[in-house]
Amino acid sequence: MSRSQNLRHNVINQVIDDMARGHIPSPLPSQSALAEMYNISRTTVRHILSHLRECGVLTQVGNDYVIARKPDHDDGFACTTASMSEQNKVFEQAFFTMINQRQLRPGETFSELQLARAAGVSPVVVREYLLKFGRYNLIHSEKRGQWSMKQFDQSYAEQLFELREMLETHSLQHFLNLPDHDPRWLQAKTMLERHRLLRDNIGNSFRMFSQLDRDFHSLLLSAADNIFFDQSLEIISVIFHFHYQWDESDLKQRNIIAVDEHMTILSALICRSDLDATLALRNHLNSAKQSMIRSINENTRYAH
C-alpha cells in the first residue's frame, strides 16, 4: 500500500471515530475546514468524503454532506501496516488533532491502546511518543499503559516562552537573510493569504487557527535549518494549544488577535523590514505569553 493510501485510510478511521463520538457536526464543515482540522490536502478530503458516501455514512445535499447514519468500524480500514517512521508521523498528526478537538483534556486518563486504535497505529508507536512528551511534564504515567494529562503553572509557561523567544527571534534573522530565490519567500506569501482567508471567515472557523499557527511557526523556524529547533516546535505547539483548550471563554478573540499579529509579522517579513518584523514578533510572543498566564491563573482560581 502506498504512503498516500496509508494516510487516507488512517484519516478515514479518525473521521469515523470523531463522527461516532459526536465531534463532527452535520452537515459537515467545508472541505477547506476539514483539510485544516486533519492537516491534509483538499484532494484527500474529497477521497474521504467519497468513501463515506459510498458506505452510506454520508449523503450529499447540494454542496453539503449530511451524516446519514452513525458509522461503525466496518466502514473503516484495518490497522495500518506502514513503517514505524510513517506511523510516527500519522500519530503525531492524530495526537495534535485530538488536542485541538478537545478529545484529550486535563485530568483525564487514557490508555495507549485507546489512542492506538483511534489513530490506526501500533501501540508501540504511541508508547514511544508519549514517553517523549512525559519528559516535558505534559503527561503523567499512571500505571503501565495508562496516562493522564497534567496542568502546569505560571513558572512553566514563562520557561516555555523563554525558549520560544530565543528560537524564533534567532530563526527570524535567518529568514530575513534568505536569498531571493529561496522557496520560503513564496511560502511566506502563501501563508499570508491563508491568514487572510481565515480572518475573513473566522466567525465559524476560529478553531482552525491552531493548525495555521503551527504551520506559521514551523515556516519561521525552518529558516534556521536546525533539526533541534524543529523538534522543539513539536513540543511547544502541543503544550501551547493543549493548554489553550482548557479555557474557551475568549478563545475566539485570542485567535483573532493572533491572526492579525501573524499577518503583521508576515507583511514586514515579505517587505524585508528587519526592525518591523522583529518588533512584531516580540509583540506577538509577549501577547501570547500574557494570554496564557491569564488563562493559567483563571484555571487555578476555579480549581480552588
From Swiss-Prot:
Induction text: Highly up-regulated during growth on L-galactonate.
GO biological process annotation, one example: regulation of DNA-templated transcription
DNA-binding region of this protein: 31-50
Keyword Methyltransferase included in the entry's annotation: no
Domain HTH gntR-type: start-end pairs: 1-70
Keyword presence, Transcription: yes
Phenotype reported upon loss of the gene: Cells lacking this gene fail to grow on L-galactonate as sole carbon source.
Keywords: Activator, DNA-binding, Transcription, Transcription regulation
Gene3D superfamilies assigned to the protein according to its UniProt record, in alphabetical order: GntR ligand-binding domain-like, Winged helix-like DNA-binding domain superfamily/Winged helix DNA-binding domain
Gene Ontology molecular function, alphabetical: DNA binding; DNA-binding transcription factor activity
InterPro entries reported for this sequence: GntR_C, TF_FadR/GntR_C, Tscrpt_reg_HTH_GntR, WH-like_DNA-bd_sf, WH_DNA-bd_sf
Origin superkingdom: Bacteria
Pfam families: FCD (PF07729)
Cited function: May be a positive transcriptional regulator for lgoD and/or lgoT. Is essential for growth on L-galactonate as the sole carbon source.
Protein's name in the database: Probable HTH-type transcriptional regulator LgoR
Annotated organism of origin: Escherichia coli (strain K12)
Taxonomy of the source species: Bacteria, Pseudomonadati, Pseudomonadota, Gammaproteobacteria, Enterobacterales
Name of the gene: lgoR
